């Protein structure tokens, strides 16, 4: 819905799909999209492939990082790179895509209200030592997404970098019974990506339904932000470029 809103405002929109079959579904659902890039962002190779395709298309004004695995993951899944799939998709992918893509004017990272139950301790971020808990792993990843958004806002002060929670909405992840307003969740993504509203032209903030919200106190701790950037750089082999 965010894509449709942006297209309706005459913005040119590129979408992402995990594989070719899904890309065809996306093209049928949003035929006005400029392009669809394809790649499995659970792997470093797939993340790099997506970034390469995006950069080949030219400069983007805004990027919305909204790919994610939900809290219902029943077991730990290990990727080809030996990482937790939850961490790879929800945290490392937005980090590496941010580091590899030509910098846009705005970055939008999707978090969740569940981030407030998350932990920013990276000691066992891959869930190798702990018994798997999908809900906790998801909450942790969504807190790390806020840390990432705020770290980018601090490192790249000329860019607008924000995070948001769309709410518990009726998507494939949220399920059909989710009670929140899907339209408002999507509108907030589009608003942060493209609006000239002064309230949207800010950086290092967290939103819900276009309103600033409190975050987990750890999200503002610069040492935790830096630790996350260092950890992701170690895993991916690429540090976040200087501003």
Q: For each of these PLM feature ranges, what is it?
A:
Residues 1-17:
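Canonical Rossmann dinucleotide-binding motif of NAD(H)/NADP(H)-dependent dehydrogenases/reductases
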Residues 16-20, 41:
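N-terminal Rossmann-fold cofactor-binding loop
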Residues 30-45:
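Rossmann-fold cofactor-recognition segment
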Residues 41-59:
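Conserved Rossmann-fold cofactor-binding substructure of NAD(P)-dependent oxidoreductases
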Residues 53-65, 71-77:
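A glycine-rich helix->loop->beta "capping" turn
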Residues 68-76, 83-84, 106-158, 165-178:
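Catalytic loop of short-chain dehydrogenase/reductase
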Residues 163, 179-230, 234:
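C-terminal helical subdomain
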